From Swiss-Prot:
Acetyl-CoA binds at residues 81-83, 120. Its EC number is 2.3.1.82. One of its GO terms (biological process) is response to antibiotic. NCBIfam families: AAC_6p_Acine, AAC_6p_group_E. Catalyzes the transfer of an acetyl group from acetyl-CoA to the 6'-amino group of aminoglycoside molecules conferring resistance to antibiotics containing the purpurosamine ring including amikacin, kanamycin, tobramycin and netilmicin. InterPro entries: Acyl_CoA_acyltransferase, Aminoglycoside_N6-AcTrfrase, GNAT_dom. It comes from Acinetobacter baumannii. Substrate binds at residues 22, 25, 66, 79, 115, 136. The keyword Translocase does not apply. It catalyses: kanamycin B + acetyl-CoA = N(6')-acetylkanamycin B + CoA + H(+). Residues 1-146 form the N-acetyltransferase domain. Homodimer. This is Aminoglycoside N(6')-acetyltransferase type 1.
Length: 146
């Protein structure tokens, strides 16, 4: 397995995996992806097999605003991670997360946070397997006023 930061030439591999994680409109993804790869406080990684098949992606950021459950700032934040089902439980997600931890230290981060939907038990289990622990549960509300 080979893990590398994403460049412009790898947008199609990233897009394919990103659409599996967040099934949305490709044109919206592409526009956002092109912006993300230019931002120093964002990290995008792809994992490839020895035969150059893209099998996993990770997106992370450095957040300077308050992050639920953390005590410091800045905080590394796992924005999204996806491993093709047939490659799960083989250490790929661990390898991706370790790369973020190394990168985040350049920004003086001492905490690494993430979130998951309350009902996404698969994500909860993955986070725990990667060394994260639950800090709090939050339900967001909104009210239209105009």
């Amino acid at each position: 397995m080979n893990i590398m930061p994403i460049s412009e030439s790898q947008l199609s591999d990233w897009l394919a995996l990103r659409c599996l994680l967040w099934p949305d409109h490709e044109d919206v993804h592409l526009q956002e992806m092109r912006q993300l790869i230019t931002q120093a406080h964002r990290l995008q990684l792809l994992a490839y097999t020895d035969t150059q098949q893209a099998i996993a992606m990770l997106e992370a950021s450095i957040r300077y605003e308050y992050v639920n459950g953390t005590q410091t700032s800045p905080v590394a934040f796992l924005e999204g991670i996806f491993v093709l089902p047939e490659y799960r439980r083989s250490g790929i997600a661990t390898g991706l997360v370790q790369q973020v931890e190394i990168w985040a230290k350049q920004f003086a981060c001492t905490e690494f946070a993430s979130d998951a939907a309350l009902d996404n038990q698969i994500s909860h289990a993955m986070h725990q397997a990667l060394g994260f622990h639950e800090t709090e549960r939050v339900v967001y509300f909104k009210k239209n006023i105009g």
